[in-house]
Amino acid sequence: MSFLIDSSIMVTSQVLFFGFGWLFFMRKLFKDYEVRQYVVQVIFSVTFAFSCTMFELIIFEILGVLNSSSRYFHWKLNLCVILLILVFMVPFYIGYFVVSNIRLLHRQKLLFACVLWLTFMYFFWKLGDPFPILSPKHGILSIEQLISRVGVIGVTLMALLSGFGAVNCPYTYMSYFLRNVTDADILALERRLLQTMDMIISKKKRIAVAHRTMFQRGEVHNKPTGFWGMIKSVTTSVAGSENLSLIQQEVDALEELSRQLFLETADLHATKERIEYSKTFQGKYFNFLGYFFSIYCVWKIFMATINIVFDRVGKTDPVTRGIEITVNYLGIQFDVKFWSQHISFILVGIIIVTSIRGLLITLTKFFYAISSSKSSNVIVLLLAQIMGMYFVSSVLLIRMSMPLEYRTIITEVLGELQFNFYHRWFDVIFLVSALSSILFLYLAHKQAPEKHMAL
């Protein structure tokens, strides 16, 4: 009876997560597009529901909600379904919609979709060869074979996003990195943009007048007769077409310049708004957060370097370890086990909420940046694939933030994976991503004033 009650709780929560994913799809991703494939919407919502359910089970594990055997069953079921979606269903439909957009392959789209899926499976399987991610005990058809490969891709994605976010967050929030932009700078750039637009209009008028003149001459005058008349008409038309092509090239160059000027003007307006915002109370608060995240970024890079150099992976969760160090240093009586459980629960909850929120914001921005009416279905499926892999790998990494007694079922469900490898791999990719982001933002910040002065 308790199993039925536990299952009804899980099904209800999954329905709620599915509904939230459906609303997010309708309200955020596809609100500007008329063409909607319901199979894409269902796949995205199901992926979102089962991804969130994994985080829900982590919280249930810490709080002791549901029976232990029920949690184990739903962990196993949830993991099997999410792997089925990520490895078989989503890649196949991505290939199917890619082929559907190619007219030459339209008649045999099912066949070519299968070919693309088999190609994906080949490279997906070969991905596990260079990495020490499995125990030798696992067979070729075991669930660990799939989790291990999905984990490598997901951890790589998480580390890339975390490395960039750790650097970009203080860069975005801190007023120290803002350029000094005045109204005179904006007016000067807008004046140059208007001058460029005037030049484009005048040159397009010249082209239009020339075309009209050539058309009228062809209408009014009879075709030239005689040998010399034909030579004269050919040379005149060639010279005229060359002049028009030169003017058109100038127009193309000016239009490209106008696009750059427009983007630069928008950037200056945004910077000016950020300067004004930084003077408000909320802006000062985010500026303080920027300094805090700067310290956190330096600390994370330092710890990642230490972990890589000394091949170190923590055996104790960070909260328990931090409390033990503080208690020993201060020499006070403190129930480390009791409080570490509660603080770990709060920490894991914050990680889960911020992970879901941050990923959804990133997915929305990414979708708007590259989608179109033809590619939107493929992009949504790619986002579903990224989201699922991201959440599976989050479970692999969050496991280390939990006290040992809460890791048991998660470890049993995930199997005998080489968990230390994933943490070491995360540190390597995080370090590369963070250092690359620092270099990129430094060059962009240094180049921006020079570009502004040149304009």
Curated annotation (Swiss-Prot):
GO terms for molecular function: voltage-gated monoatomic anion channel activity. One of its GO terms (biological process) is protein transport. The chain crosses the membrane at residues 5-25, 46-66, 79-99, 111-131, 150-170, 290-310, 343-363, 378-398, 425-445. It catalyses: iodide(out) = iodide(in); chloride(in) = chloride(out); bromide(in) = bromide(out); fluoride(in) = fluoride(out). It holds the Pfam family ABA_GPCR. The keyword Transmembrane helix applies. Disulfide bonds: none annotated. InterPro entries: ABA_GPCR_dom, Golgi_pH-regulator_cons_dom, GPHR/GTG. Belongs to the Golgi pH regulator (TC 1.A.38) family. Homotrimer. Voltage-gated channel that enables the transfer of anions such as iodide, chloride, bromide and fluoride which may function in counter-ion conductance and participates in Golgi acidification. This is Golgi pH regulator. The gene is GPR89.
